[in-house]
Amino acid sequence: MAATLLDVCAVVPAAGFGRRMQTECPKQYLSIGNKTILEHSVHALLAHPRVTRVVIAISPGDHRFAQLPLADHPQITVVDGGNERADSVLAGLQAVAEAQWVLVHDAARPCLHQDDLARLLAISENSRVGGILASPVRDTMKRGEPGKNAIAHTVERADLWHALTPQFFPRELLHDCLTRALNEGATITDEASALEYCGFHPALVEGRADNIKVTRPEDLALAEFYLTRTIHQEKA
């Protein structure tokens, strides 16, 4: 029987540091406008009426989150994250044991559009596995020689997608797949890869390519541009 349009909980793993940003401040706490990247990311989730609760997994030594307005938000729960992303997601899943479906969203992905989120959430009407936001690969892709800055070969880009977030799955299925994959030593780079490891095939829901993750210093200005443009479009 297909799932109905039930309320959804979200998990945001925010315990990482992001050393590629070359800053002393964890990237999720860098500011764009008058909000941190984390606040932009979380507010995009809470803007959808189906998302009733957001669990944020932070580092046990994190002293920055308590200073944000988010810390007092009634729909937000904070848990201690782990050393790896999967550990933080599992900690978040434990806090929403009553949820049937969960979103997992990157703390440093602040440019999520509401129409993309709505399309992703709609798959719960006829899916038992879930899916992810993704964008088709547009550039020519090259495989590098191991340990060298040299091209090994060109990778056929047909059917290649950039995996984005949020990713959206039945809570119990995601919990079981993450647990099994970690116990068996599998390499888990996102939540969908845990389901793939266990033999499932999540759906690809095409999303906007400007739903970027802030990873490098130059991404900050780009994210600010996208967010400013979106605000102006909403006011128009």
Curated annotation (Swiss-Prot):
Q: What is its EC number?
A: 2.7.7.60
The biological process GO terms on file are: isopentenyl diphosphate biosynthetic process, methylerythritol 4-phosphate pathway
Show the InterPro entries listed in the entry: IspD (IPR001228), IspD/TarI (IPR034683), IspD/TarI_cytidylyltransf_bact (IPR050088), ISPD_synthase_CS (IPR018294), Nucleotide-diphossugar_trans (IPR029044)
Q: Where is this site: Transition state stabilizer?
A: R20, K27
Show the GO MF annotations: 2-C-methyl-D-erythritol 4-phosphate cytidylyltransferase activity
Q: Which reaction does it catalyse?
A: 2-C-methyl-D-erythritol 4-phosphate + CTP + H(+) = 4-CDP-2-C-methyl-D-erythritol + diphosphate
According to UniProt, residues marked as the site described as Positions MEP for the nucleophilic attack are R157, K213
Give the source's domain of life in one word.
Answer: Bacteria
Protein keywords: Isoprene biosynthesis, Nucleotidyltransferase, Transferase
Name the pathway: Isoprenoid biosynthesis; isopentenyl diphosphate biosynthesis via DXP pathway; isopentenyl diphosphate from 1-deoxy-D-xylulose 5-phosphate: step 2/6
The region annotated as signal peptide is none
Alphabetized PANTHER family for the sequence: 2-C-METHYL-D-ERYTHRITOL 4-PHOSPHATE CYTIDYLYLTRANSFERASE, CHLOROPLASTIC (PTHR32125:SF4)
Would you identify the family this protein belongs to, as annotated? Belongs to the IspD/TarI cytidylyltransferase family. IspD subfamily.
Describe its assembly: Homodimer.
Q: What does this protein do?
A: Catalyzes the formation of 4-diphosphocytidyl-2-C-methyl-D-erythritol from CTP and 2-C-methyl-D-erythritol 4-phosphate (MEP).
**Full protein name:** 2-C-methyl-D-erythritol 4-phosphate cytidylyltransferase
Could you tell me which species this protein originates from?
Answer: Salmonella newport (strain SL254)
Lineage start = Bacteria, Pseudomonadati, Pseudomonadota, Gammaproteobacteria, Enterobacterales
Please state the gene responsible for encoding this protein: ispD
